[in-house]
């Protein structure tokens, strides 16, 4: 759109809170628009993420936060990615760690408070952590690309990078 945000289609901007960010799939998971592509792509990514924040999470579900974490990690925003994952874990998961879609704590992070169990939120959560630790979707392996300041002692072993590489780092 005129502000640089991704839209659903020409003339159909993201203007109402919704649990799916299908208009932003080019950022994640597809990686068709990537931070490393330069200023124009960075502007699109920043504007799209800003719009998500501005419209707000009224009708998001837990996996919306997991997906947001992946997109924030792709934008090298470790603080934002960590906050989204924290919200997912604290507000949208049951004590057994199952994702229950709705805000189980009624914290105001979503108007949905229902409990349908779905796995995609948990899978996206795990993917978000990996995106924070290791990215390789562009053909370049980046280690610790989106680590928040509070993660002072970070390491991982045998994460899989594109090209069948196993990577470990401290």
Roles of regions detected by a PLM:
Residues 1-140, 151:
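Active-site core of glycosidic bond-cleaving carbohydrate-active enzymes
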């Amino acid at each position: 759109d005129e502000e640089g945000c991704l839209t659903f289609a020409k003339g159909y901007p993201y203007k109402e809170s919704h649990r799916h960010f299908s208009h932003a799939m080019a950022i994640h998971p597809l990686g068709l628009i990537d931070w490393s592509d330069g200023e124009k792509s960075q502007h699109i990514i920043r504007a799209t993420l800003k719009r998500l924040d501005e419209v707000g999470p009224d009708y998001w579900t837990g996996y919306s936060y997991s997906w947001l974490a992946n997109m924030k990690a792709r934008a090298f925003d470790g603080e934002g990615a960590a906050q989204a994952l924290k919200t997912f874990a604290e507000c949208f998961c049951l004590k057994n760690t199952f994702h229950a879609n709705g805000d189980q704590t009624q914290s105001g992070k979503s108007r949905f408070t229902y409990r349908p169990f779905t796995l995609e939120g948990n899978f996206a959560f795990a993917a978000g952590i990996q995106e924070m630790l290791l990215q390789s979707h562009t053909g370049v392996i980046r280690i610790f690309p989106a680590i928040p300041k509070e993660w002072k002692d970070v390491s991982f072993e045998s994460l899989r990078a594109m090209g069948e590489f196993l990577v470990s780092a401290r």
